[in-house]
Regions:
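Alpha-helix N-cap and coil->helix boundary residues
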Residues: 20-21, 40, 44, 60
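Charge-rich, solvent-exposed alpha-helical interaction surfaces
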Residues: 6, 25-29, 48, 78
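Short, amphipathic alpha-helical interaction segments positioned at domain boundaries
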Residues: 71-84
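A short, conserved structural fragment
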Residues: 53-63
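Positively charged, polyanion-binding regions of nucleic-acid-associated proteins
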Residues: 1-17
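Minor-groove-contacting beta-hairpin "wing" of winged helix-turn-helix DNA-binding domains
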Residues: 63-70
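Short amphipathic alpha-helical interaction segments
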Residues: 37-54
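Short acidic, hydrophobic short linear motifs in intrinsically disordered regions
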Residues: 15-36
Length: 84
């Protein structure tokens, strides 16, 4: 667990803009998080509605992604729980 937490920390510190492998489990957690975030933002915008497409990563090739922004800290616990 400590190793995985350290890897997530390193990914956030040095991974932004670099290509990395994203496991299907972690990808699903991130997708769910950003979808909920998108829905919350859309529901609060009554007049000006913008399309939110940024999931925090961009697929470069199958299974490999470019991290566009750090993984949210509240997701670290969720990710660690899936690896128990």
């Amino acid at each position: 667990m400590k190793l995985l937490a350290h890897l997530i920390y390193l990914l956030n510190e040095q991974g932004v803009g670099n290509t990395f492998y994203l496991s299907p489990i972690i990808k699903k957690i991130l997708d769910n998080h950003y979808e909920q975030e998108r829905k919350a933002k859309l529901s609060t915008m009554k007049i000006y509605i913008r399309k939110f497409t940024n999931n925090g990563y961009l697929e470069k090739e199958p299974g490999h992604y470019i991290l566009l922004k750090p993984i949210p800290t509240d997701l670290t616990t969720t990710i660690l729980r899936t690896w128990k």
